[in-house]
Swiss-Prot record:
UniProt cross-references to PANTHER family, sorted A to Z: CHROMOSOME TRANSMISSION FIDELITY FACTOR 18, DNA LIGASE
Record gene name: ligA
Keyword Zinc attached: yes
Biological function: DNA ligase that catalyzes the formation of phosphodiester linkages between 5'-phosphoryl and 3'-hydroxyl groups in double-stranded DNA using NAD as a coenzyme and as the energy source for the reaction. It is essential for DNA replication and repair of damaged DNA.
The protein's name: DNA ligase
Length: 668
């Protein structure tokens, strides 16, 4: 590491922790990664490097000192008496040699390993009593996970009853196969929903569903690889896996016991070549000391077991030539460039296009038509240009010129302040109209069954609709003009359109596609102000007064409703008979005055008088907002026994600390 002062190390480490916390929250808790794995890994390893060089800068809440992400408050919490720790990562064979040397030094002799494929999914614990499945839970933060038993019962390869009346806990990986992932994303795209970035996030989003029927539809699978506290007769990893397979668990047939590191390297080479032909995603291999007694001897660090390591595959790259750069217009008018390239085989699929995101990104990469570029798949799924091979750039190459007019309607593009994107601000732009209608009809919005992208394209091409209000004037004769649209389809679509008139107003607000106003914000605003006429008259501060609604959302909403075009559209929808009122449950009665009303509270440690869920509900009934992490916005931290990093962070930030008993005394 280059020379660096203590102050410089503190500053860089603090910046890295902030970024890594945000990325980890997006990955673990929201199932929506914001950066590629290798970017996260590089930043994480840099933080480790700094903390190793300057131990005094390590903080209790550093991501290097904990496992996984925050716990979702919608699920019942599950304690893991034996923590579900994450694994250390290495990225080269030299680092694996160092791991092997470390193992031999610690145990005093050569070590045999059990190797497994590193499945790209999420960790899952299964508990059985007398042979019956009684609980399934996620890893969560390693010590407390989420109860997903109801959902796990819909995963076909999880045994509900074992052939023997055993009381055991096993652990493994829940994943989504490549075929199921492709099918799910195609369905979501057809319905106008955002697609999942990779199978891991699709699996996590599918398992962590409040509605088990959604999980059932998603075709999840498992590989089980750990028996927690196995019986004495089981003395090795490979023996435990064989026995779990006999009990009916789905284990990975590729795992094997290997005598030395040379055999491990052969295994890595074999599956580096085979990975794209597998029916499920892998991102490396896992190396475990096979002898369970040695595992006990080696133990764990605070964060990872000493006896296992994950070797991560490097991203696969291919070279290809950029033949064109095309621009497409989205629902909100954002114009996005895409590189069109000579097709290449990459990570198991043919790739011919890659997003260039925005003009700044395009200029930063320096991509030109005719350039040879290196291409990889972010998360093994999303094609992305890594770099331009400048040594192969044609002699007559010229810099690419960013367009100034919309590719759909020809009007001038604008660059709004504080945005990197180019926008078309013509509300009649055909491309925006098409995307807007697709969004309006999608499941999170008006949920008009049968009105997918292909039908919308035809309606616009045949000049039958120009905005969402026109949908409510469609007739049987209009729909009969569409290709392959018969009487049954016509009747079904007209019925679905008519039924959508009865939707609660928050679905209409969502369907309008207002920038920064998603389904959750729309519901909160509708719940508070009850009808669209009232909402359209609100000022920025009125909307921003709602907890969790920020100024950006409030400003965007008031700006939208101030436009004459928007007001005209709402009036047309009203005249067509659309409901303009909130039909959902009323807001809970206002809580009486108490010390926790309108306060942000964090619970930590083991509570004795209430379960975590019970105390959370009690505080929420008193008007408190209960969150999972401590920050400057936290008003109180209530702690029980064995309180950990949240307690320490509260002390650092000066957040008031209350014991469970002190908190109860203030509310009872």
């Amino acid at each position: 590491m280059a020379k660096i002062t203590l102050d410089e190390a503190k500053k860089e480490a603090a910046s890295l922790r902030t970024k890594l916390d945000e990325w980890a929250d997006a990955y673990y808790s929201k199932d929506a990664p914001e950066v590629e794995d290798n970017v996260y890994d590089q930043s994480y390893n840099r933080l480790l490097e700094l903390e190793k060089a300057f131990p005094e800068i390590v903080t209790p809440d550093s991501i290097t000192q904990r496992v996984g992400g925050e716990i979702d408050s919608d699920f019942t919490k599950v304690n893991h008496p034996i923590p579900m720790l994450s694994m250390g990562d290495v990225f080269s064979k030299d680092e694996l040699k160092e791991f092997d040397q470390r193992m031999q030094k610690l145990v005093g002799h050569p070590v045999e390993y059990n190797v497994e494929l590193k499945i790209d999914g999420l960790s899952l614990s299964l508990e059985y009593q007398d042979g019956k499945l009684v609980r399934a839970s996620t890893r969560g933060n390693g010590y407390i996970g989420e109860d997903v038993t109801a959902n796990a019962r819909y995963i076909a390869d999880i045994p509900q009853v074992l052939p023997e009346p055993l009381t055991i806990e096993v652990r493994g990986e829940c994943y989504m196969g490549k075929e199921a992932f492709a099918k799910l994303n195609q369905e979501r795209e057809d319905e106008g929903l955002s697609v999942f970035a990779n199978p891991r996030n699709a699996a996590a989003g599918s398992l962590r569903q409040l509605d088990p029927k959604v999980t059932k539809k998603r075709q999840l699978s498992t590989f089980i690889y750990t028996w927690v506290n196995p019986p004495r007769e089981i003395t090795s990893q490979h023996q435990a896996i064989e026995r779990m397979h006999e009990l009916g668990f789905h284990t990975n047939e590729t795992g094997r016991k290997l005598a030395n590191l040379d055999e491990v390297f052969d295994f890595i080479d074999e599956y580096t070549a085979k990975r794209n032909s597998l029916t499920y995603g892998i991102d490396g291999i896992v190396l475990k000391v096979d002898d369970l007694s040695l595992e006990q001897q080696l133990g764990n660090t605070v964060k990872v077991p000493r006896w296992e390591i994950a070797y991560k595959f490097p991203p696969e790259e291919q070279e290809t030539i950029v033949r064109d750069i095309v621009w497409t217009v989205g629902r909100t008018g954002v114009v996005t460039p895409t590189a069109v390239m000579d097709p290449v085989q990459l990570a198991g699929t043919t790739v011919a296009r890659a997003s260039l995101h925005n003009p700044d990104y395009l200029n930063e990469k320096g991509v030109r038509i005719g350039d040879t570029v290196k291409l990889h798949k972010a998360g093994d799924i999303i094609p992305e240009i890594s770099e331009v091979v400048l040594s192969k750039r044609p002699a007559d190459s010229v810099p690419y010129e960013i367009p100034t007019t919309c590719p759909s309607c020809g009007q001038k593009l604008v660059h709004l302040e504080d945005e990197v994107a180019l926008r078309c601000i013509n509300p009649s732009c055909p491309a925006q109209v098409e995307e807007g209608i697709i969004h309006f009809a999608s499941r999170p919005a008006m949920n008009i069954a049968g009105l997918g992208p292909k039908i919308v394209k035809q309606l616009i091409a045949k000049d039958l609709v120009h905005n969402v209000a026109d949908l409510y004037h469609l007739t049987e004769d209009d729909l009969a003009q569409l290709d392959h649209f018969k009487e049954k389809s016509i009747n079904n679509l007209l019925t679905a359109i008519d039924n959508s008139k009865k939707n609660s107003v928050e679905l209409l607000i969502t369907g309008l596609g207002i920038d920064h106003v998603g389904a959750k914000a729309a519901r909160l605003i509708a719940q508070k102000f009850k009808n669209l006429e009232k909402i359209m008259s609100l000022g920025v501060q009125d909307i921003a007064s709602i907890d969790t609604i920020g100024m950006t959302t409030a400003e965007s909403m008031t700006t939208y409703f101030a436009q004459p075009e928007a007001q005209k559209l709402i009036e047309e929808l009203r005249e067509s008979g659309l409901n303009m009122d909130y039909l959902g449950a009323d807001e809970p009665e206002e809580a009486p005055d108490n010390p926790f009303k309108d306060k942000t509270v964090v619970l930590t440690g083991k509570l004795e008088h209430y379960t975590r869920s019970e105390f959370t509900k009690k505080l929420q009934a008193l008007g408190a907002k209960v969150t999972g992490s401590v920050s400057h916005k936290t008003d109180y931290v209530i702690y029980g026994k064995d309180a950990g990093s949240k307690y320490n962070k509260a002390e650092q930030l000066g957040v008031p600390l209350l014991t469970e008993e002190e908190a109860i005394a203030q509310i009872e």
